[in-house]
Swiss-Prot record:
This is Growth arrest and DNA damage-inducible protein GADD45 gamma. InterPro entries: GADD45, Ribosomal_eL30-like_sf, Ribosomal_eL8/eL30/eS12/Gad45. Two central helices mediate homodimerization through parallel packing. Keywords: Apoptosis, Developmental protein, Differentiation. GO terms for cellular component: cytoplasm; nucleus. Gene3D superfamilies: 3.30.1330.30. Undergoes concentration-dependent homodimerization, which is required for growth inhibititory activity and enhances interaction with PCNA. Interacts with GADD45GIP1. Interacts with PCNA. Changing residue 83 to R: 30-fold reduction in homodimerization affinity and 90% decrease in growth inhibition activity and ability to stop cell cycle. Belongs to the GADD45 family. The gene is GADD45G. Involved in the regulation of growth and apoptosis. Mediates activation of stress-responsive MTK1/MEKK4 MAPKKK. One of its GO terms (biological process) is regulation of cell cycle. It holds the Pfam family Ribosomal_L7Ae. It comes from Homo sapiens. Residues 43-86 are annotated as: Homodimerization.
Amino acid sequence: MTLEEVRGQDTVPESTARMQGAGKALHELLLSAQRQGCLTAGVYESAKVLNVDPDNVTFCVLAAGEEDEGDIALQIHFTLIQAFCCENDIDIVRVGDVQRLAAIVGAGEEAGAPGDLHCILISNPNEDAWKDPALEKLSLFCEESRSVNDWVPSITLPE
């Protein structure tokens, strides 16, 4: 039996539960960040925030559905944002359901159209470290993913 086979046997139920936990934590974090007014939505808006104050950004969500796979410009933006986040120790995840993300965050005046939800940044509301349990859970999830060379893990949001 190879190491991959042993790992595959042990981690299938664990990884499913881990993924569901991360999805629920992301849902909670998005709602909490929106309530506190520390959520930035949109690729260009996020790039501006990352350029001006990267030390204040705590988490990044990249969202793209199947219809966005052919959008070369969006993929280039994602690559640049991922590189910037990795360089500045900002945890980052991918979500494959932009419509579900729009339902959680809401496409209000702040977010604009659902097309503006391809990148979401969560910032600290003030100078003090933000102690959100969902953020801590997601940071641990990202750290565990990086330990197995999954630098931008994908998360499925709960229904």
